[in-house]
């Protein structure tokens, strides 16, 4: 097939008529929060417009690839319910969706651009690293002014080369971004970036333009760090005579006011957050609000399901200002989602964490019921329930509590009265234990808390517990409860 026929065929394949977005990660490690936000916004744009969401793997930088990272991408997208309509695993009308499998395409389009005058062959030794280092001075490059036929003769002779973008020496380039508006730059400030490296692989900046065009991408979402490259992308589109997609540049997610989030500095990836006990839905909800806010009647709303986000999402809500990742705020979101779960679903999610500390034959569902309103992260659970298996050593001062009007002497009297009452209960249920303790407090002429405090301390050995004396005693069982209360009484003797 001739190159002309090839280009005609490629253009004919381009889908048209609806919004098409793409998430195009590089398989270089875990899904960091900025990447997850890009995936989410890209997915939301497609879904809110009834469009198509594409997953593309950008693996042209072979030196940075990490084994297994592509599987992490698939797994994360599936867990987050960001289902794609086209991609490497399911195919589609503009396959392949892995850049390393499109190598010939980039070479053909780079050569086409050189024929159009928008690029040139560069044979300089300074290109030997195969990558433009950023200090390239096009004014000093004799290759820029080579006649195309002379350059092609050198290529035919086997001379190593790169293909560089031919940036106009004068004038300005203006591009439009959906977030930042119109931006104009002086062409003299732009470098003749490498498009095709000596090994025949494209640079990121070239491959993404070619792929976005050939895949019919209408909206390109990326970080604001790429704003400086956008005028060069714009010039590439115009040099080919192609329509420019809508750019959506998102400001960075920051660790604090001065520093961007970075895996190198220990900032969490999506998988890290999952391992720390955060729910996927809570993570997505929080990440959606890192740089975007709803408008109108939803302006004060914080909690959004994915379906609700699809209905609410609008590009006008994306902020130019950086967003600061606040773990305390994420804790709040996670707590809301934990409390909204059905008791059955929460118990299922909590059980592995409960079992990290509780090995005995206890009612896991009952323990989970105590926890649901009292934890912000699933990983909080083991420490909260470790007393069920074995009562920890505790200080006798735990029995002193000003609000409950207790001290060691008072608690000794309370336990001396509570032990025989609990031993004599005909049934060991929450209701029976509760009613028995309340009646005993009335009989002793003390506040309920004055009796409940020492019973809970002796039963759990901790100042702070999920649930109170009644629930803890019921789950421990009569025999273990009485054993622990007697041990507490011995401490007070």
Identify the role of each PLM range.
Residues 1-30, 48-53, 160, 170, ...:
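Non-catalytic terminal extensions that flank enzyme cores
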Residues 47-61, 206-219, 240-254, 467-469, ...:
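Glycine-rich phosphate/pyrophosphate-binding loops
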Residues 119-249, 255-261, 269, 426:
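Active-site cores that bind ATP or allylic diphosphates and position pyrophosphate for catalysis
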Residues 286-287, 334, 368-375, 451-459, ...:
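Short alpha-helical scaffolding segments that buttress acidic/His motifs in well-ordered protein cores
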């Amino acid at each position: 097939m001739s190159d002309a026929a090839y280009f005609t065929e490629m253009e004919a394949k381009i889908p048209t008529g609806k919004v098409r977005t793409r998430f195009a990660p590089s398989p270089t490690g875990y899904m960091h929060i900025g990447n997850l936000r890009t995936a989410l916004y890209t997915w939301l744009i497609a879904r809110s417009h009834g469009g198509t969401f594409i997953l593309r793997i950008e693996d042209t930088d072979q030196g940075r690839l990490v084994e297994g990272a592509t599987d992490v991408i698939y797994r994360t997208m599936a867990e987050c319910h960001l289902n794609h309509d086209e991609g490497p695993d399911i195919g589609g009308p503009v396959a392949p969706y892995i850049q390393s499998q499109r190598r010939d395409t980039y070479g053909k389009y780079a050569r086409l651009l050189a024929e159009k005058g928008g690029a040139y062959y560069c044979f300089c030794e300074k290109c030997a690293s195969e990558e433009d280092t950023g200090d390239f001075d096009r004014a000093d490059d004799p290759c820029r002014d080579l006649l195309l036929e002379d350059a092609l003769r050198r290529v035919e002779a086997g001379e190593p080369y790169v293909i560089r973008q031919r940036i106009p020496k004068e004038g300005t380039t203006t591009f439009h971004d959906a977030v930042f508006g119109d931006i104009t730059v002086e062409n003299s400030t732009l470098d003749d970036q490498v498009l095709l490296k000596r090994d025949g692989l494209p640079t990121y900046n070239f491959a993404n333009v070619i792929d976005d065009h050939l895949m019919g991408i209408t909206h390109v979402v990326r970080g604001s760090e790429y704003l400086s490259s956008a005028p060069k992308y714009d010039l590439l589109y115009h040099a080919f005579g192609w329509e420019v997609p809508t750019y959506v540049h998102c400001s960075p997610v920051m660790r604090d006011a001065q520093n961007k989030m970075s895996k190198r500095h220990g900032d969490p990836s999506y998988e890290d957050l999952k391992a720390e006990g955060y729910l996927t839905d809570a993570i997505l909800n929080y990440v959606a609000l890192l740089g975007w806010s709803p408008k109108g009647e939803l302006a004060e709303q914080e909690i959004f399901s994915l379906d609700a986000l699809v209905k609410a999402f609008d590009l006008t809500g994306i902020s130019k200002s950086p967003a600061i990742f606040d773990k305390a705020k994420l804790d709040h979101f996670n707590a809301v989602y934990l409390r909204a779960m059905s008791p059955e679903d929460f118990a299922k999610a909590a059980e592995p964490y409960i079992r990290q500390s509780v090995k005995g034959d206890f009612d896991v569902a009952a323990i989970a019921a105590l926890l649901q309103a009292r934890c912000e992260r699933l990983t909080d659970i083991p420490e909260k329930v470790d007393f069920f298996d074995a009562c920890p050593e505790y200080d006798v001062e735990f029995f002193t509590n000003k609000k409950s009007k207790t001290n060691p002497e008072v608690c000794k009297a309370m336990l001396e009265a509570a032990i025989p009452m609990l031993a004599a209960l005909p049934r060991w249920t929450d209701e029976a234990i509760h009613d028995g303790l309340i009646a005993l407090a009335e009989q002793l002429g003390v506040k309920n808390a004055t009796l409940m405090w020492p019973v809970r301390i002796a039963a759990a050995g901790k100042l702070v517990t999920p649930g109170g004396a009644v629930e803890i005693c019921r789950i421990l069982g009569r025999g273990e409860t009485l054993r622990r209360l007697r041990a507490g009484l011995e401490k007070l003797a």
